[in-house]
A protein has these predicted regions:
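A cross-kingdom feature that marks ATP-driven nucleic-acid transaction machinery
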Residues: 1-79
Length: 79
């Protein structure tokens, strides 16, 4: 498993998953949970999660509230 993008601030890490598929389902949350479980930040540093996606996102992914941020690639690119 690889972390697609890792952002760091003084007190937190943000693990970013980037997905480009026709259908993006709940399995994306399972994959990220495993990455977070394996990630070992220094003590006192929080871990946040984000998803950048291109495709059709299953409504349950957003409704679940697991990701701290969900960003469509089109918005990121200003399209």
């Amino acid at each position: 498993m690889q972390i697609d993008l890792l952002l760091q601030t003084r007190m937190s890490f943000c693990l970013v998953e980037i997905k480009r598929r026709l259908q993006i389902g709940r399995e994306v949350m399972d994959e990220m949970r495993e990455k977070v479980r394996r990630f070992s930040p220094p003590k006192g540093v929080s871990v946040r999660t984000a998803l950048i996606y291109d495709g059709e996102l299953a409504p349950s992914v957003e409704a679940d509230g697991y990701f701290d941020a969900i960003v469509p690639a089109r918005r990121l690119l200003g399209l």
